[in-house]
Amino acid sequence: MGKRAKMIAKIKELMEKYDRIRNIGICAHIDHGKTTLSDNLLAGAGMISKELAGEQLALDFDEEEAQRGITIFAANVSMVHTYEGNEYLINLIDTPGHVDFGGDVTRAMRAIDGAIVVVCAVEGVMPQTETVLRQALRERVKPVLFINKVDRLINELKLTPEELQSRFIKIINDINNLIRKMAPEEFKDKWLVRVEDGSVAFGSAYNNWAISVPFMKKSGITFKDIIKYCEEDRQDELAEKAPLHEVVLDMVIKHLPSPPEAQKYRIPHLWKGDLNSEAGKAMLNCDPNGPLAGVITKIIVDKHAGAVSVCRLFSGRIKQGDEVYMVNNQQKAKIQQVSVFMGPERIPVDSISAGNICALVGLKEASAGETICSPDKIIEPFEAITHISEPVITVAIEAKNTKDLPKLIEVLRQVAREDPTVKVEINEETGEHLLSGMGELHIEIITKLKIERDAGIPVEVGQPIVVYRETVTGQSPVVESKSPNKHNKLYFVVEPLEESVLQAYKEGRIPDVDTKRKLDDKIVQELIKAGMDPEEAKRVMCIYEGNVLINMTRGIVHLDEVKELIIQGFKEAMRNGPLAAEKCQGVKVKLMDAVLHEDAIHRGPAQMIPAARFGIRDAMMQANPVLLEPMQFVYINTPQDFMGAAMREISNRRGQILDMEQEGDMAIIKAKCPVAEMFGFAGAIRGATQGRCLWSIEFAGYEKVPRDMQEQLIKQIRERKGLKLE
């Protein structure tokens, strides 16, 4: 039996021992060393050859990733590690750190129970570290800390042992402050990372060594030895004495939970069904003999197998030929193949049981976030996976050859299924395909990689367009609106939605709702908690994309029969704002009164939808409407000498500097800029700092467009959309 075959046999055996499984992720800021760490862990566990590790970036197996030197898609791999005489199976997901790919990170968090947070010792805790940690804690994922690039503190920055210590203490305190701030109540103290119990490790992923307090006690190596090895350039010897994989994987096994342990507190948070039901109990206990329940966290498209779904099973087991039911899609599918991951390869297995992460072939229509169960025991779906960012840039895309059009439509649908942070729509008037993403790099990866390289369709990509929103800032008077046949009248008032309610909607605490009957009491309570007037909250008819329609009427005959049509009109008004036909957000529409014709034939869709739509639009025009533009936080890390140039670059783009820190000879600038001004920023900032800065961006919500620009901007958008210019 070759080494590889032994490894596969081991993995198959351990998959059935639930307390010996660890599902973990590695998360960090871009370039802090995630992928190098995961490769060297793989090499240590005998999965790829040692000579290549660190250079090979086994998990960056997409040629585009290897070229750019950044991880774009989350990759999966399984490995075996022995700790205190027992063997453990570790399923590792490497997630991207670049901000344009935040969606991948959020989805990976659903599949794992613990995370190694990697922080670069030189740069410290960065904005993206904070974002990723927040996502982990929100999904109830327990963290441990690995401080990377320690050799650079010793060799490049020449820090003394005292300075080293204070640098480490600062990083650990920063991480613990974030955990205190963001962890769920019951874990605020339990989950803090501590040097003394070994939930913090230090080392150099690139040079393949690491150290932790338990390992020092076990091996007798001290911090002084480490400084000596680094100064004398004998890090390869150090890697033999204190191997990275041993220290880090020991920490993972000791401090991160097994599936049965983690599911006890994760399931109540992730799944809103009845925990006392058969499925609920099976998931809490990670029971392989219970009803099937799993969540699909990612779709990978394979040239040979088609769509491969990455799935975390919470209960039951799944084997080839099984029929499963997809809850969100409401359809059945047959599993053609079940396999586990080893880097870029999938190894077919007979069956997979609860607690494991696997790859399934055969779920053609599945999208990320889908819940799967068995057709005879249908369960409640898992909560929608909430993404922190939303698409802010749109490009028009068309095939260079008309014959590629059907193929292009298929690829765009597939991309939207794989990545929920991408939106694809067809502009009805112009017939263009519009692709929206989270930033320039995100869009470029999709068009160059997924469409041109993988699908082989040459495309023309239009100029990037910024996605604006509309809202109101004042309250309108009561506006009367008549149906086209003049037999029905609706009376509306429009005002801004409470800021706190909009925030709760964005964080996913309040869902989209259409109600024909009474609103679910849970949602009413959430609305009141978020600051809505209790009387209004009880009368909500519809919540749609951050706008709310409230029925303030009393005792109107026939109103129930036209409710759906009024909701339809409200949605149309919210999709096309009055200023520039952009989507609205944060608008509260109240239906104050209605006079309806008693004959149903005179209050059909052709009468009621326009009455609602135009009435709401007129009311918005009298409620001081404004245009909102998307903003981004910009974080720049630059040498002091280039600080002025970097700040000029920001202020030339209507940016505001929010914060500035100095650490050694580096300046850290935190600013906020409109997305509209950020095109071409990558090249400009490189030029301004002679390529010596690191920068990243993060979505920062929508803000009002400056008044002096609004009129011109509305004119431009209307012109682009071919609307009348009045």
UniProtKB/Swiss-Prot annotation:
Role according to the record: Catalyzes the GTP-dependent ribosomal translocation step during translation elongation. During this step, the ribosome changes from the pre-translocational (PRE) to the post-translocational (POST) state as the newly formed A-site-bound peptidyl-tRNA and P-site-bound deacylated tRNA move to the P and E sites, respectively. Catalyzes the coordinated movement of the two tRNA molecules, the mRNA and conformational changes in the ribosome.
Keyword RNA-binding: no
Domain tr-type G, chain residue ranges per copy: 19-260
Main localization category: cytoplasm
KW DNA-binding (keyword) present: no
Binding site for GTP: 28-35, 94-98, 148-151
Gene: fusA
Localisation: Cytoplasm
PROSITE patterns associated with the record: G_TR_1, G_TR_2
Protein name: Elongation factor 2
Alphabetical list of SMART domains matching this protein: EFG_C (SM00838), EFG_IV (SM00889)
Keyword vocabulary terms for this entry: Cytoplasm, Elongation factor, GTP-binding, Nucleotide-binding, Protein biosynthesis
Entry similarity comment: Belongs to the TRAFAC class translation factor GTPase superfamily. Classic translation factor GTPase family. EF-G/EF-2 subfamily.
GO biological process, one term: translational elongation
Diphthamide modifications at: H602
Pfam families noted in UniProt: EFG_C (PF00679), EFG_III (PF14492), EFG_IV (PF03764), GTP_EFTU (PF00009), GTP_EFTU_D2 (PF03144)
